[in-house]
Swiss-Prot record:
Sequence ranges on the Periplasmic membrane side: 1-2
Stretches of the chain found on the membrane's Cytoplasmic side: 24-336
A GO BP annotation: FtsZ-dependent cytokinesis
Pfam families to which the protein is assigned, alphabetical: ZipA_C
Bilayer-spanning residue ranges: 3-23
Protein name, entry field: Cell division protein ZipA
Compartment list: Cell inner membrane
């Protein structure tokens, strides 16, 4: 009888241990599979300090802009401008009745041109020769002023020569029916051309830019980025970035907008995409675009919002601020 009681007690203890172990194992597996990791993450806030922009190498107009800058640099060469001014001054000719034009041309070529320093007047060999250069007797050096640039000095000399020609024509020393007035007008046009060359062209902002950034302290994985872009109709192509063509699936159709990596150099290396991660993406559209700009912008905005939702990021405007209704109206005003 005592053995039966002892057996029942041991069986009950064994059953209790098995039940306890089963409950503990089930709870541990449940916590491992269904653990809520969002409670341990920091608050999701957009990245405030973003200094990245569209890489210059990805802009199709970068080559043209670089070529334009080289052209401006060559145009601003002081030596070249000085030579052009001297050539313009040598073209100023005043022919008097009865004077040999060849002898007068040789005198003009022998006459020195101002190069920033005053020169002594040349003694005339003929009584009828006209001194068209400015007399420097009244020029006093101003030591308190800063030295002028070669462009300013050459322009000043040209203005003095033009004023001297006009004064002599008004006094009757030069035949007013000759081609002197025409050459004076030529000198004025040369000065206007030099002043226009000094002006820098203002580049217009002809590109719409939107950003998709990850929450603070997080990054987008490369395989997720590529999968999301392909699902939205992007195709990997030129410049090693993704493009959205006018006709989805047809890479021969024109590109409407593109997406690049926000981090330099801005490309997507598909051979190393499993090790790739980024803090954000930049979507840009050149204006004017192929087709209707308003329709293309709405497609760009909708695609950007879907991409941000798929990756769990935020949409920012070109000023790296949260894209709101005011930003939407501002962008629509630019494409309208």
């Amino acid at each position: 009888m005592e053995l039966h009681i002892l057996f029942f007690i041991l069986a009950g203890l064994l059953i209790a241990v098995l039940i306890s172990f089963s409950l503990w194992s089930a709870r541990r597996e449940k916590s491992r599979i269904f653990s809520n990791t969002f409670s341990t993450r920091p608050p999701s806030t957009p990245i405030n300090n973003i200094v990245s922009d569209v890489p210059p190498s990805l802009n199709p107009q970068s080559y043209a802009q670089t070529t334009g800058q080289h052209g401006e640099t060559e145009a601003d060469n002081p030596v070249q401008i000085q030579q052009e001014v001297e050539s313009s001054l040598r073209e100023i000719k005043i022919n008097l009745p009865g004077q040999d034009s060849a002898a007068y041309q040789s005198k003009v070529e022998e006459t020195p041109i101002y190069s920033g320093q005053p020169v002594l007047p040349v003694q005339p060999q003929y009584q009828t020769q006209v001194q068209y250069q400015t007399q420097p007797q009244h020029i006093e050096p101003a030591f308190t002023q800063a030295p002028q640039s070669p462009i300013a000095e050459a322009t000043s000399v040209l203005e003095q020569s033009v004023e001297e020609l006009e004064r002599q024509a008004a006094q009757g020393d030069v035949d007013i029916y000759s081609d002197a007035s025409v050459r004076v007008e030529l000198a004025k046009n040369s000065m206007q051309a030099d002043s226009v060359a000094e002006q820098k062209p203002v580049a217009e902002n002809n590109m719409l830019t939107l950003y998709v950034v990850a929450p603070e302290g997080q990054q987008f994985r490369g395989d997720y980025v590529v999968q999301s872009l392909e699902a939205l109709g992007f195709q990997y192509g030129e410049y090693q970035i993704f493009h959205r063509h006018q006709h989805m699936g047809n890479s021969a159709s024109p590109v409407i907008f593109s997406v690049a990596n926000m981090m330099q150099p801005g490309i997507f290396d598909l051979t190393k995409i499993e090790h790739f991660s980024t803090v954000g993406l930049v979507l840009f559209m050149h204006l004017p675009s192929e087709g209707n700009d308003v329709v293309n912008f709405k497609l760009l905005l909708k695609t950007t919002e879907n991409l941000a939702q798929a990756l769990g990021g935020f949409v920012l405007n070109e000023h790296r601020e949260i894209f709101d209704e005011n930003s939407r109206q501002s962008y629509l005003a630019r494409v309208s």
